Amino acid sequence: MFKENTVKLGIAPIAWTNDDMPELGAGNTFEQCISEMALAGFNGSEVGNKYPRNTVVLKKSLALRNLEIASAWFSTFLTTKPLEETVEEFIKHRDFLHDMGAKVIVVSEQGHSIQGLMDVPLFKNKPVFTEEEWNKLADGLHHLGKLAQEKGLHIVYHHHMGTGVQTTAEIEKLMDMTNPALVSLLFDTGHLVFSGEEPLYILKKYLPRIKHVHLKDIRQEVVDTVKENELSFLQAVKNGAFTVPGDGVIGFDEVFTILANSDYQGWFVVEAEQDPALANPFEYALKARKFIQEKAGL
């Protein structure tokens, strides 16, 4: 289905240890995490909170298992803090990823975000940016995009539950306000369906701008409970709203077909944060790998 050597398969370490709730998977070590990724048949991963920040140490650990770094999340605060604060941290992050050989930097605006708040209802309290904040966000992303390109990288914007860029309208507004040469899009199946959006619409409309893909499924019954009981994003994760592709309600056939027929080159990263005590990360990594092999031929 996919042209040879165009797509690499990664998996996020958040299934082993959760960055937002470190108590989930606290006993899972870095070495266990990357060893199980390799055993499950993946080519690489994104960066988790247990990963060494010393690139020499990290490269050696990954090379032993034939793994690469696909990218790493970066939180921007362009709507709520001075640009300089985000830029200073971004440059360190950019240089780290450049040294690790990554080609994209995942960015997500966390100004007013409720995704990390345990007791704030997800759908009821979703932030909405003012026009001034939208302008700050777009201008700031252009600045970060230029900084990324100084080292040959691209920023990919991660639309995300509980943030100011979550819905179809918000994604469209951000894409309209930003330069395609400087700001690309991360396509995440799970966050779109969780929000009630139509993922194929976003995929088709912004296909040329999509430079990174997160493969994530959802358990609809948990999402329904989150809405009915006004739960937070973190409570949704703990209750199992997300799972690996093939284990939930999202149909991936057309997603894979559209991407295979496009010029997409880059990573597919399985990112399915859930409680590792309830969903063994190695078992679910194997499940995801088998599904992708069957559906995408990768």
UniProtKB/Swiss-Prot annotation:
SUPFAM superfamilies named in the record: Xylose isomerase-like (SSF51658)
GO molecular function: manganese ion binding; myo-inosose-2 dehydratase activity
Gene Ontology BP annotations: inositol catabolic process
Known cofactor(s): glutathione; Co(2+); Mn(2+)
Disulfide bond annotation, renumbered to this chain: none
Keywords: Cobalt, Lyase, Manganese
Documented EC number(s): 4.2.1.44
Pathway it works in: Polyol metabolism; myo-inositol degradation into acetyl-CoA; acetyl-CoA from myo-inositol: step 2/7
Catalysed reactions, as listed in the record: scyllo-inosose = 3D-3,5/4-trihydroxycyclohexane-1,2-dione + H2O
Record-linked InterPro entries: IolE, IolE/MocC, IolE/XylAMocC-like, Xyl_isomerase-like_sf, Xyl_isomerase-like_TIM-brl
Gene3D superfamilies: Divalent-metal-dependent TIM barrel enzymes (3.20.20.150)
Stored PANTHER family: HYDROXYPYRUVATE ISOMERASE (PTHR12110), INOSOSE DEHYDRATASE (PTHR12110:SF41)
Family designation: Belongs to the IolE/MocC family.
This protein's name: Inosose dehydratase 1
Source species of the chain: Bacillus cereus (strain ZK / E33L)
Gene name per UniProt: iolE1
